[in-house]
């Protein structure tokens, strides 16, 4: 595990085992400033800042992923493989077409997939839809 990386100035151990990951860097800052206690900036590269602090007594980090699959792939790969992160929770906003989903409702997605060639670059067959661990949200 070699840290820092080209995309992350943090040292090993700076990130918590659980990282909240919005796409927008300003949303990451908002989460750190409004929800984390004793938040400390651990990464500041290319406008993608990462913070580590405490939420309800649990050590948690938050870092933006930037826009698109290539960007989140880079950051997620480094967090898992270089920094020992165990759980990334993607947080953000989305549109809805269901009549019973209202503005500001919280929706927990069971899985997500894409019709891009991204999964093929990892030799995953077809439209791969990984299903997350329900432990962090139960």
Predicted regions and their residues:
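Metabolite-binding pocket within alpha/beta catalytic cores that recognizes anionic/polar moieties
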Residues: 1-138
